[in-house]
């Protein structure tokens, strides 16, 4: 009887070894099988480990250098600045530019739209109206948009056709935008004096996807870009 028990015990141990060998080689454990202490170790590309621990940045001040050249052709003349803003705000349809620059591009396009001037010859009978403007310089922009990625001063060109019930045409914009490290005091880019009044500035900025807010010191900031 003792011999029989030893034989059964010996066969059982051999069977266990066969099972282990089979699991190790023919059917390896899953990638996250905790029995083997094996867990995924591949990096999560595109996820910044610091993003969850960043404190609220609050209001920031960004010194930028910029240039924006804007050309617009229309089927009929614009009747007002609001009319022009409504049409030109369509410049970012199917936007494929730098995502981090988009809020500041919107601000530059708003200002460039305010400064549009018509070519006199284009307003003659039979011609399609042509408008153009160009702004450039160095300014400071206050914002509460969170982390802004590095921005190199390189050009991007946007060409878009627009078509509304009342008018249609073509928009061509070339924009240079980058962060500057100048130590000089710079004038704010958001300046209500460029507009008829503060209401005009805030309402047309909404057409361009921006929310501007006035601070206690009477300076303005980009509070939201949507």
Curated annotation (Swiss-Prot):
MF terms (GO), sorted A to Z: structural constituent of virion
GO cellular component: host cell cytoplasm; host cell nuclear membrane; membrane; viral envelope
One of the protein's GO biological processes: viral budding via host ESCRT complex
Stretches that traverse the bilayer: none
Primary location recorded for the protein, binned into one broad class: virion
Sequence motif: dynamin binding, positions: 2-4
Compartment annotation: Virion; Host endomembrane system; Host nucleus membrane; Host nucleus
InterPro entries cross-referenced by the UniProt entry: Vesiculo_matrix, VSV_matrix_sf
Post-translational modification: Phosphorylated by host.
Keyword match Membrane: yes
Phosphoprotein in keyword set: yes
Topology in membrane: Peripheral membrane protein
Pfam families reported in the protein's UniProt record: Vesiculo_matrix
Annotated keywords: Apoptosis, Host cytoplasm, Host membrane, Host nucleus, Host-virus interaction, Membrane, Phosphoprotein, Viral budding, Viral budding via the host ESCRT complexes, Viral matrix protein, Viral release from host cell, Virion
Residues spanned by motif PTAP/PSAP motif: 40-43
Residue window of motif PPXY motif: 28-31
Oligomer and partners: Homomultimer. Interacts with viral nucleocapsid; this interaction contributes to the virion assembly. Interacts with the viral envelope glycoprotein; this interaction contributes to the virion assembly. Interacts with host RAE1-NUP98 complex. Interacts with host NEDD4 and TSG101. Interacts with host dynamin. Interacts with host NDUFAF4; the interaction inhibits viral propagation and is independent of interferon activation. Interacts with host GTF2H5; the interaction may inhibit host transcription.
Domain comment as written in the entry: Late-budding domains (L domains) are short sequence motifs essential for viral particle budding. They recruit proteins of the host ESCRT machinery (Endosomal Sorting Complex Required for Transport) or ESCRT-associated proteins. M contains two overlapping L domains: a PPXY motif which interacts with the WW domain 3 of NEDD4 and a PTAP/PSAP motif, which interacts with the UEV domain of TSG101.
Family recorded in the similarity comment: Belongs to the vesiculoviruses matrix protein family.
Function: Forms a double layer around the helical nucleocapsid, the inner matrix layer binding to the N helix and the outer matrix layer binding to the envelope glycoprotein. Plays a major role in assembly and budding of virion, by recruiting cellular partners of the ESCRT complexes that play a key role in releasing the budding particle from the host membrane. Condensates the ribonucleocapsid core during virus assembly.
The protein, known as: Matrix protein
Gene: M
